[in-house]
């Protein structure tokens, strides 16, 4: 990471400009992101400004505005050419040093310690862990929430493999939260724990930096009781899944959740989804299958998976697992989310789609598309924990919901290109967008209708 003092000196020496604290924060942020994205020094970032005729004669105020506006054009070249940039929508936070003591995730998963609530001390889930890891330390606690409040954790401990086996007391079932003014697909979430043994640079769970490890409920039978009551009021089938705050299958060889979930949902008028980045399907292949049980995989180019999705299965491993599950009689689905606007994104995502349709039989239950998006806290956490990652140095701006998103012209190009590529192979699989507004949805040809999303996916 280049030194702030050095940049300040270079600006003063080369450009004859002394910045106040707030001005320097903005300039440093822009210069830092350009240097990271393009892998160049601060000298190279400032070089074009030194050559600007008459710059040295500008007043200090004009120099600052010219410097900032020029760096904005370098930082957001495509958007600068397509539209006027509202500077209020540029997130210019203070540049921070990355963590030196960040916990590194290394497969295979091995828990560091298990905390178990008293009410579930005799649970099968704890027995499963102890059988797999006979020397693991186990500590009995009353409530995990109370433990976390009295034992403070830092972001550097975020991915420590601490396991909390708990009795879930909240709502097992809830609607998938959808951003205001964005279209919902009618999805329901089955709350099957919190946290993930994988470590993706873009994962929004990083915002919950005060809680390390994984929370796993031991009382899944209470969910079945709850869902039996809930389902009596359903007027039509729903889609429900477990992959919102955890990976559905990453630890299935230990938790064995699938062994009870799949038989339970086979007889229900729902589409039940298990969402994963793993190839942990051994338990599934021993179970009776049904098309209403959908196993879905998140897909990104192989190079992106290697760089940004630590400890996950490779792209090839995911597709091989999907083919086995499909051949066993389960439904399969795929999520291109987040799609990252890389330099050669058309080629990279096109290759993923080519490989997908060469290995599996169409049609699929569904395919969703969603471009990279995050709140400001997530970008900061990613910079601290993944200093080698450049994904947030693409052309991302704060939207109405205060999330960082690509501008409409980039999103629309991505969605249309990928939809067209899928349609070359497959006219039947329903394609939908995740967390997008109606205006964007209606501009893309080939998606399920924006006014009938839920019914189109059931």
Task: Label each residue range with its predicted role.
Residues 1-185:
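Flexible, acidic/Gly-rich N-terminal and inter-domain linker regions that tether
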Residues 113, 237-241, 271-273, 292-296, ...:
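Structural preference for beta-strand elements that scaffold enzyme active sites
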Residues 164-182, 201-296, 324:
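Conserved Radical SAM active-site core
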Residues 247-249, 279-282, 293-312, 338-342, ...:
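Conserved radical SAM core fold
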Residues 255, 297, 345-361, 388-393, ...:
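Short, electropositive alpha-helical surface patch
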Residues 308-309, 340-345, 365-402, 438-446:
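Flexible glycine/acidic-rich beta-alpha junction loops that bind and position SAM and/or redox cofactors
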Residues 318-378, 421-433:
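Conserved C-terminal portion of the radical SAM core fold
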Residues 390-458:
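C-terminal accessory regions of radical SAM enzymes
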């Amino acid at each position: 990471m280049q030194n702030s003092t050095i940049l300040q000196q270079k600006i003063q020496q080369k450009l004859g400009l002394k910045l106040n604290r707030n001005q320097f924060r903005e300039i440093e942020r822009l210069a830092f992101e350009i240097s990271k994205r393009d892998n160049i020094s601060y000298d190279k970032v400032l070089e074009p400004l030194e050559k600007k005729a008459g710059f040295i004669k500008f007043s200090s105020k004009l120099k600052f505005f010219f410097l900032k506006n020029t760096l904005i054009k370098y930082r957001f070249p495509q958007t600068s050419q397509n539209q006027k940039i509202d500077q209020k929508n540029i997130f210019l936070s203070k540049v921070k040093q990355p963590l030196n003591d960040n916990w590194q995730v290394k497969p295979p998963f091995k828990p560091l310690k298990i905390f178990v609530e008293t009410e579930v001390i005799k649970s099968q889930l704890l027995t499963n862990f102890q059988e797999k890891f006979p020397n693991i330390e186990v500590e009995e606690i009353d409530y995990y929430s109370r433990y976390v409040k009295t034992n403070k954790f830092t972001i550097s401990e975020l991915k420590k493999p601490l396991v909390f086996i708990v009795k879930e007391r909240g709502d097992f079932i809830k609607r998938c939260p959808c951003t205001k003014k964005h279209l919902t697909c009618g999805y329901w979430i089955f709350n099957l724990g919190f946290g993930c043994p994988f470590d993706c640079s873009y994962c929004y769970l990083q915002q919950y930096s005060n809680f390390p490890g994984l929370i796993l409920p031991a009382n899944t039978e209470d969910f079945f009781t709850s869902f039996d009551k809930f389902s009596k009021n359903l007027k039509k089938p729903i889609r429900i899944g477990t992959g919102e705050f955890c990976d559905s299958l990453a630890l299935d060889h230990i938790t064995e959740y699938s062994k009870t979930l799949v038989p339970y949902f086979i007889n229900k008028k729902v589409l039940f989804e298990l969402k994963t980045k793993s190839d942990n399907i051994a338990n599934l292949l021993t179970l009776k299958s049904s098309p209403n049980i959908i196993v879905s995989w998140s897909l990104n180019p192989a190079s992106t998976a290697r760089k940004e999705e630590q400890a996950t299965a490779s792209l090839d491993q995911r597709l091989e697992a999907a083919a086995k599950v499909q051949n066993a009689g389960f439904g399969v689905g795929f999520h291109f989310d987040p799609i990252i606007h890389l330099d050669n994104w058309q080629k990279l995502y096109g290759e993923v789609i080519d490989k997908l349709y060469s290995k599996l039989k169409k049609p699929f239950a569904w395919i969703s598309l969603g471009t990279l998006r995050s709140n400001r806290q997530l970008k900061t956490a990613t910079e601290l924990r993944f200093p080698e990652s450049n994904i947030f140095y693409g052309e991302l701006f704060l939207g109405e919901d205060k999330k960082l998103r690509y501008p409409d012209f980039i999103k629309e190009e991505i969605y249309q290109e990928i939809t067209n590529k899928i349609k070359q192979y497959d006219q039947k699989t329903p394609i939908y967008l995740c967390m997008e507004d109606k205006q964007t949805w209606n501009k893309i040809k080939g998606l399920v209708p924006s006014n009938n999303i839920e019914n189109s996916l059931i």
